[in-house]
Amino acid sequence: MNPEHSPLGKATVYANQYDASLLFPIPRAGAREQIGIGAPLPFFGTDIWNAYELSWLNARGKPQIAIATFYVPAESPNIVESKSFKLYLGSFAQTAFESADAVRDALKRDVSAACGASVTVRLATPAEFRKLQMDELDGLSLDRLDLDAHVYETDPSFLTASHDEAPVEETLVTDLLKSNCPVTGQPDWGSVQIHYVGAPIDHAGLLRYIISFRNHTGFHEQCVERIFVDILRACQPVKLAVYARYTRRGGLDINPFRTNYNQPMPDNARTARQ
């Protein structure tokens, strides 16, 4: 489905009765083709969605709440457009379910169907809220650099590596990622962590490259995949992982992770801005 046909940017009727048809899938293939990604994919990973505004009724009509987390595999053929996701979650509000497990089962069934792959769903009940973590992304901050930046359209020419030097293993972070919704033009604010093994990557160039997304339009997942592919092509690291945490909009935050080597899934700790 084309993003222009999604609920984004259109007058909205908010349903309060459960309706799985509200989910609007968008194929990943189109955006991947634009940056030269085909089969097999040069990465694997997950999109972590956190939904903070989930509520339903129990069998006696009493409202229940939970925080839902969705783990969408990067190899799924589709993503779900975020406003349609919000409307879908809102449709639970006046619908009675026998249990939280029944809600989780419905979420897993519907979102898996929309994405075209098995999606893992976890619900955190109010009794578990105190266990939820908040932390910043680990790594050496690129934002410490005092530099000029004047390019705000994606420019991978900033990316360079010193292949005549000994390989290094580094984790770099920045809070200066900004991109824009391709349908509404609304800004998307994020932090990104880049871990790699290979020739040393020029830090100033990498930061200027991330800043160059400032006027770029793309969904969160697409931006992270572009970052991954541009670094892989320009700097040729042996190992590479890119993880972004975007600030919340409409009760949802989206946190894509891409890697080309086996490693544990990153934790789902919220950053301060989230």
From Swiss-Prot:
<protein>
    <recommendedName>
        <fullName>NADPH-dependent 7-cyano-7-deazaguanine reductase</fullName>
        <ecNumber>1.7.1.13</ecNumber>
    </recommendedName>
</protein>
<dbReference type="InterPro" id="IPR029139">
    <property type="entry name" value="QueF_N"/>
</dbReference>
<keyword id="KW-0521">NADP</keyword>
<feature type="binding site">
    <location>
        <begin position="249"/>
        <end position="250"/>
    </location>
    <ligand>
        <name>NADPH</name>
    </ligand>
</feature>
<dbReference type="GO" id="GO:0006400">
    <property type="term" value="P:tRNA modification"/>
</dbReference>
<dbReference type="InterPro" id="IPR016428">
    <property type="entry name" value="QueF_type2"/>
</dbReference>
<dbReference type="InterPro" id="IPR043133">
    <property type="entry name" value="GTP-CH-I_C/QueF"/>
</dbReference>
<dbReference type="GO" id="GO:0008616">
    <property type="term" value="P:queuosine biosynthetic process"/>
</dbReference>
<dbReference type="GO" id="GO:0033739">
    <property type="term" value="F:preQ1 synthase activity"/>
</dbReference>
<keyword id="KW-0671">Queuosine biosynthesis</keyword>
<dbReference type="Pfam" id="PF14819">
    <property type="entry name" value="QueF_N"/>
</dbReference>
<dbReference type="InterPro" id="IPR029500">
    <property type="entry name" value="QueF"/>
</dbReference>
<feature type="active site" description="Proton donor">
    <location>
        <position position="188"/>
    </location>
</feature>
<dbReference type="InterPro" id="IPR050084">
    <property type="entry name" value="NADPH_dep_7-cyano-7-deazaG_red"/>
</dbReference>
<comment type="function">
    <text>Catalyzes the NADPH-dependent reduction of 7-cyano-7-deazaguanine (preQ0) to 7-aminomethyl-7-deazaguanine (preQ1).</text>
</comment>
<comment type="similarity">
    <text>Belongs to the GTP cyclohydrolase I family. QueF type 2 subfamily.</text>
</comment>
<feature type="binding site">
    <location>
        <begin position="220"/>
        <end position="221"/>
    </location>
    <ligand>
        <name>substrate</name>
    </ligand>
</feature>
<feature type="binding site">
    <location>
        <begin position="82"/>
        <end position="83"/>
    </location>
    <ligand>
        <name>NADPH</name>
    </ligand>
</feature>
<dbReference type="GO" id="GO:0005737">
    <property type="term" value="C:cytoplasm"/>
</dbReference>
<keyword id="KW-0560">Oxidoreductase</keyword>
<comment type="pathway">
    <text>tRNA modification; tRNA-queuosine biosynthesis.</text>
</comment>
<feature type="binding site">
    <location>
        <begin position="80"/>
        <end position="82"/>
    </location>
    <ligand>
        <name>substrate</name>
    </ligand>
</feature>
<dbReference type="Pfam" id="PF14489">
    <property type="entry name" value="QueF"/>
</dbReference>
<keyword id="KW-0963">Cytoplasm</keyword>
<feature type="active site" description="Thioimide intermediate">
    <location>
        <position position="181"/>
    </location>
</feature>
<comment type="subunit">
    <text>Homodimer.</text>
</comment>
